[in-house]
């Protein structure tokens, strides 16, 4: 499952203060579903655990603090930051097809 923070339906550049998250299900390189979830009220360190509970394995973000990146990595969730401002299905498709132009890839493997 891929999580993407959204504002006005596209990638939100400020991870911790987004309006919604797109949770995208995929099978291989194919998107099989998209669910929109409203995050709990912002608290530092809360979102990595909340998304882990949803079964998320990858996060695509515009910008994210190092503490959040570390918390995701502790939960074995891959983080891709510096992604372009695009609709969530486009970003997920780019990730699944290894064409995502992110500035950095923070993963534990």
Regions found by a protein language model. Give the residues of each.
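Conserved SAM-binding loop
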Residues: 60-61
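Short Gly/Pro-enriched loop/turn and capping motifs at secondary-structure junctions
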Residues: 42, 64-67
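N-terminal first-folded block
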Residues: 1-39
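C-terminal structural segments of small proteins and small subunits
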Residues: 66-109
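Short acidic/polar active-site loop segments enriched in Thr and Asp
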Residues: 57
């Amino acid at each position: 499952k891929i999580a993407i923070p959204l504002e006005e339906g596209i990638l939100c550049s400020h991870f911790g203060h987004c309006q919604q998250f797109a949770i995208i299900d995929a099978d291989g390189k194919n998107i099989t579903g998209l669910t929109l979830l409203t995050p709990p009220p912002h608290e530092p360190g809360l979102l990595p655990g909340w998304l882990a509970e949803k079964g998320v394995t990858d996060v695509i973000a515009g910008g994210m603090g190092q503490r959040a990146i570390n918390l995701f990595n502790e939960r074995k969730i891959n983080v891709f930051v510096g992604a372009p401002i695009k609709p969530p299905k486009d970003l997920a498709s780019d990730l699944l097809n290894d064409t995502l132009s992110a500035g950095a890839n923070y993963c534990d493997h």
